[in-house]
Amino acid sequence: MAQYSAEFKQAKVLVLGDVMLDRYWFGATNRISPEAPVPVVRVQENEERAGGAANVAMNIASLNVPVQLMGLIGQDETGSALSLLLEKQKIDCNFVALETHPTITKLRILSRHQQLLRLDFEEDFNNVDCKDLLAKLESAVKNYGALILSDYGKGTLKDVQKMIQIARKANVPVLIDPKGTDFERYRGATLLTPNMSEFEAVVGKCNTEEEIIEKGLKLISDIELTALLVTRSEKGMTLLRPNQEPYHLPTVAKEVFDVTGAGDTVISVLATALADGRSFEESCYLANVAAGIVVGKLGTSTVSTVELENAIHARPETGFGIMSEAELKDAVAQAKARGEKIVMTNGCFDILHPGHISYLENARKLGDRLIVAVNSDDSVKRLKGESRPINNLENRMAVLAGLASVDWLVPFTEDTPQRLIGEILPDLLVKGGDYKPEEIAGSKEVWANGGDVKVLNFENGCSTTNVIEKIKLLKD
C-alpha cells in the first residue's frame, strides 16, 4: 500500500452533533468525611477535554485538516471553556448557544487512578427547535468535502433526516456513527459505521461471515445507504456495498490498551480521506490503520499524520528520538494539534550523571513531550575549552536517546539555542541551575508566544567537571 498517503491536501470536513465538555478533577483521598460515609478528595489538579462530537473534530484537526464543528451549547461558562479549548486547536466553532439548556458537561472526580464519581450536567435537546442549526448547516455544507453526523443520543440530531437531505442535495457525503437500534432514522446516509454489537442489535445475531454480508447488504437496501462499514474489534472491519465484493481489513493493532474513542478515530479518518477524494477502499484502509494506532494508547487519543504515515509504510515512528530541525518542527506541530504540552531544555550533556537523569525526569513531568537540544562539538569546545567535549555529539545524543524521559533530541551549532527555541516555541522552557528566568536563552521568545519559563534545581554534588576531575585523579 506504498501509494497511500496520510497527507490530506484537499480535505475539509464538517462535523455536526452532540458536543460535550469532559472535566476531570484529580486529588488525594486520605480520610472519610465526618458529614457522611464518603471519601474527602483534596483536589490538586484539573483537566478539560473535548467530548462527543467535539472529540471527533479534535481527531480531524490532529490530521492538519480544516474542520468546522456545529452543535448546541448553553450560554454558560462551560460552553465558553469548550469553545476556547477547541479554538486553540484551530477548530472553527459554529455553535447555537441556548439560554434554556446547559452545555453538556461530564465531571469526573478521580483519586489514585480510580474514578470515584461522575456528575452529568445536561438536559435533553429533543424539545429544542433546531431551525438555526439547520440554517447553519445549509449555509456551510457546500464548502466541505464530507459531513460527519456525530450521534450520542442527546437530541442534537433529532432532525437527522433533514440534515442528511441538506447534505445530499449539496452532493456532500454523510457519514454517521449510529446510536441506538433505530437505523431507519439514518435513511439515505452515505455510510454508517456501527460496531459489531450495534450491528447485531439491529439485524440479529451473525454466526458466520456470510450472515454478516447478507444482513449487511439487506440493511443497505432497506435504508438506502451507499455503504456500510462494520467495525469488528480484533477481527478488523468489513466494508459492504451493493453489487461489489466485500472488502475486509484485518486488525493492525499490535497491542490493545484502550478502545476509548476508537470509533471517533475511525469515522474521522474515513471522512477526511473521502473529503480528500480517496476511494472507499483507501479510506477504510487508512481508518483501519489509524484505529490500530489509537487502541495502543491509554485514554481518548487522536492520531497524527506522522504516526499514520509511518504506520502505512511500516516505518518506526519518527515521533521519538534524534531529529533534524525540520523533522522536529513537524513532530511538534502534530503534538500540539493533539493538545500535548511541549517542554524544552538544552545542554552539553558531555558525561551523563545522576544529576542529569533526575533533572530530565523532573522536566518531563512538567508536560507531555520533552525536547532536549544538544550543543554540537564545536559549540561545546567554545563554551568549555579545547579539551571538551569528552564524548562527541553522536555518542552524547545516543545515550540521551536511551532515556525514557526524553522524547526528541536535536543538535544546535550556536553558543546558545535561542534561535532554535524561537523556531520551535515550546509551551514551557526549562533550565537547570542558578539562572533567573529572564537570563535563560530563548525566554523572551517563549514568553512572547504565551509560553512559560521555569528554573529547576540540579542535584548537589553532581557535575560533569567533578566526574572529569575524579578520572584525572585516578589516572595520576
From Swiss-Prot:
Source organism, top-level taxon: Bacteria
EC annotation from Swiss-Prot or TrEMBL: 2.7.1.167, 2.7.7.70
Broad class of enzyme this protein falls into: transferase
Record keywords: ATP-binding, Carbohydrate metabolism, Kinase, Multifunctional enzyme, Nucleotide-binding, Nucleotidyltransferase, Transferase
GO biological process: ADP-L-glycero-beta-D-manno-heptose biosynthetic process
UniProt keyword Kinase, yes or no: yes
Region annotated Cytidylyltransferase, chain positions: 344-476
Residue numbers annotated as active site: D264
Molecular function GO labels: ATP binding; heptose 7-phosphate kinase activity; heptose-1-phosphate adenylyltransferase activity; phosphotransferase activity, alcohol group as acceptor
Any GO CC annotation of this UniProt entry: cytosol
Positions contributing to ATP binding: N195, M196, S197, E198
Ribokinase: annotated segments: 1-318
Pathway the protein takes part in: Nucleotide-sugar biosynthesis; ADP-L-glycero-beta-D-manno-heptose biosynthesis; ADP-L-glycero-beta-D-manno-heptose from D-glycero-beta-D-manno-heptose 7-phosphate: step 1/4; Nucleotide-sugar biosynthesis; ADP-L-glycero-beta-D-manno-heptose biosynthesis; ADP-L-glycero-beta-D-manno-heptose from D-glycero-beta-D-manno-heptose 7-phosphate: step 3/4; Bacterial outer membrane biogenesis; LOS core biosynthesis
Catalytic activity field: D-glycero-beta-D-manno-heptose 7-phosphate + ATP = D-glycero-beta-D-manno-heptose 1,7-bisphosphate + ADP + H(+); D-glycero-beta-D-manno-heptose 1-phosphate + ATP + H(+) = ADP-D-glycero-beta-D-manno-heptose + diphosphate
Regions that span the bilayer: none
InterPro entries per record: Bifunc_HldE (IPR023030), Cyt_trans-like (IPR004821), PfkB_dom (IPR011611), RfaE_dom_I (IPR011913), RfaE_dom_II (IPR011914), Ribokinase-like (IPR029056), Rossmann-like_a/b/a_fold (IPR014729)
Record Pfam families: CTP_transf_like, PfkB
Function: Catalyzes the ADP transfer from ATP to D-glycero-beta-D-manno-heptose 1-phosphate, yielding ADP-D-glycero-beta-D-manno-heptose.
Similarity remark: In the N-terminal section; belongs to the carbohydrate kinase PfkB family. In the C-terminal section; belongs to the cytidylyltransferase family.
Quaternary state and interactors: Homodimer.
Protein name (Swiss-Prot/TrEMBL): Bifunctional protein HldE
Species: Haemophilus influenzae (strain ATCC 51907 / DSM 11121 / KW20 / Rd)
